[in-house]
């Protein structure tokens, strides 16, 4: 839930996130252009990446398909690599939002190393031993 009085600017390539944020009066929404992936309703490609390069977000919340302490963040779709890399490169801090089932998994295309994240947030129970593998790599684990 987003508090009604939260004032911020959201830069996104996701139409779903843009819609949710647009319902809050205090949130300014900037949508990146590019090629539309209809399955996820996100924009991707070089146009989106070039637009993202014009911004320097304080904080980037990155949804994660697969993450591993050794192999970093990986995704199954090559079209998403450039926009994700650019958002990570441009941001001061990057927080990974991870379903516990995605921990210690690897997909086809590497986006970044684990060291590119400052924090990992998960929405479920994670065994202490698994969490330690990420903490030992320097991540805050919430």
Task: Cite the ranges covered by each PLM segment.
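Conserved phosphate- and dinucleotide-binding cores of soluble alpha/beta proteins
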Residues: 16-142
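Active-site catalytic pocket residues across diverse enzymes, especially alpha/beta-hydrolases
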Residues: 1-6, 21-25
């Amino acid at each position: 839930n987003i508090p009604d009085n939260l004032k911020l600017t959201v830069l996104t390539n996701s139409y779903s996130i843009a819609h949710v944020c647009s319902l809050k009066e205090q949130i300014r929404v900037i949508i990146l252009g590019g090629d539309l992936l209809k399955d996820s309703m996100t924009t991707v490609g070089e146009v989106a990446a070039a637009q993202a390069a014009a911004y320097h977000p304080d904080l980037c919340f990155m949804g994660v398909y697969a993450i591993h302490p050794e192999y970093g963040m990986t995704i199954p779709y090559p079209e998403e690599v450039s926009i994700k890399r650019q958002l990570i490169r441009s941001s001061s801090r990057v927080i990974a939002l991870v379903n516990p089932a995605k921990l210690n998994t690897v997909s086809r295309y590497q986006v970044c190393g684990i060291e590119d994240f400052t924090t990992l947030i998960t929405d479920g129970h994670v065994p202490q031993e698994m969490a330690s593998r990420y903490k030992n790599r320097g991540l805050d684990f919430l």
